[in-house]
Amino acid sequence: MDNTSSVPWASAASVTCLSLDAKCHSSSAKSAASSISASPETQAMRHIAHTQRCLSRLTSLVALLLIVLPMTFSPAHSCGPGRGLGRHRARNLYPLVLKQTIPNLSEYTNSASGPLEGVIRRDSPKFKDLVPNYNRDILFRDEEGTGADRLMSKRCREKLNLLAYSVMNEWPGIRLLVTESWDEDYHHGQESLHYEGRAVTIATSDRDQSKYGMLARLAVEAGFDWVSYVSRRHIYCSVKSDSSISSHVHGCFTPESTALLENGVRKPLGELSIGDRVLSMTANGQAVYSEVILFMDRNLEQMQNFVQLHTDGEAVLTVTPAHLVSVWQAESQKLTFVFADRVEEKNQVLVRDVETGELRPQRVVKVGSVRSKGVVAPLTREGTIVVNSVAASCYAVINSQSLAHWGLAPMRLLSTLEAWLPAKEQLHSSPKVVTTAEQQNGIHWYANALYKVKDYVLPQSWRHD
């Protein structure tokens, strides 16, 4: 049976393609007829304009198909673990037990909520960074009567709102209760994230303690960075600081880190341009040169926390914690990708061999951290890049290199289509040269859009939360 016969949009797409093709051929015929008496310059200009019109129509069609195509799949047709497209799969959630914390680490480690950054008072410059939460699905006890319990960091508000939605789904008629958020009265220990608006103490509106284990699990699923079922009376949750969010959300390198160009020259990432061909890595660990097609993030002024991986061959990779790094599994002889802040000493990463130019495993001998200025996240067509001789992914946040690479497929397709278009310089007498200073500053719109939807389509176990 023909697949297009059972999928209405496929037939429509076929008709559209034929229509576009007919229009292009029709316009080509008209152009050919009128170009008999036209000068060579006029004919060239008409040809360029005609090509651009056809490719513009093709680009619109491809964009439409990219939007409609995923909607035609059901969960039964999706591959791999996790949630499929369409309705979410039902997953078994297990409640936390009393005294359990997730992750099972100190709250102030980088893999949890991160270090303290200082108490925020009403007269502190950072007080303006706290935001009120007026979600009607959340009850705030507000014992002080000052509205302080509604104030929190942006990340804390985001996760709390997600949790409130989960609570209503889990227990219809029950709402999330916040008993403490930002604290200005020093009711907690000397080292508490309540003073920074990064922690909340929560319960359910019916105060049913039998629900608290599952409430803690829902908080983990909502993306809180540290959850503790420390007391029978409430659940404690905290998040990373907003200032470290971009390092956590978008994987980046330092601008001073270098990439190897195809001509053999090493170039700082802060000076890379779209179109540069840099050393990358194939899916099976082979060295290959790949084109830079965009920057997912680029900000040369932003201060950021980085993880530093030192190898026994004296290579040093400086990268944000949520970035994926290639790790060689010697026992299984397989290449995997691991979040940078979860790489451990004695793990092996792939490093370029100076003599052969091939990528070889080197042992990590030290894992450190550093705070530095500037972030750069180039995306190559291959989805990988060798930085400071160490092979790394171009992706972050999601612990699947293949899924992340699939998610950026529209950008690779768009880059290919743009390459087919006649150069704009053909329409102008003097081409414009784009300097480094004129390049993108900030997060790419498509990467930012993917980040915003990830919490709604991916399980927490797939995310660096």
Swiss-Prot record:
Which sites carry lipid of kind N-palmitoyl cysteine?
79
Marked site (Involved in auto-cleavage) residue numbers: 320
Where is Ca(2+) 2 annotated to bind? 144, 180, 183, 185
Coiled-coil positions: none
State the superkingdom: Eukaryota
Q: One GO CC term of this entry?
A: nucleus
Pfam families named among the record's database cross-references: HH_signal (PF01085), Hint (PF01079)
Q: Which residues are tagged with the site Cleavage? A: 251-252
> In this chain's numbering, which residues are marked as the site (Involved in cholesterol transfer)?
297
What name does this protein carry?
A: Protein hedgehog
What does the record list as GO biological process?
A: Bolwig's organ morphogenesis; cell-cell signaling; cytoneme assembly; epithelial cell migration, open tracheal system; genital disc anterior/posterior pattern formation; germ cell migration; glial cell migration; gonadal mesoderm development
What are the record keywords, sorted? Autocatalytic cleavage, Calcium, Cell membrane, Cytoplasm, Developmental protein, Hydrolase, Lipoprotein, Membrane, Metal-binding, Morphogen, Nucleus, Palmitate, Protease, Segmentation polarity protein, Signal, Transferase
Q: Where is the lipid attached (Cholesterol glycine ester)?
A: 251
| Localization (cell) | Nucleus; Cytoplasm
Q: Which GO terms describe its molecular function?
A: calcium ion binding; cholesterol-protein transferase activity; morphogen activity; patched binding; peptidase activity
Family under the similarity heading: Belongs to the hedgehog family.
Broad enzyme group: hydrolase
Kindly list the positions annotated as binding Ca(2+) 1. 143-144, 149, 179-180
What assembly does the database describe for this protein?
A: Interacts with shf.
Report the EC code(s) recorded for this entry: 3.1.-.-
Organism of derivation: Drosophila erecta (Fruit fly)
**Site for Essential for auto-cleavage, residues:** 323
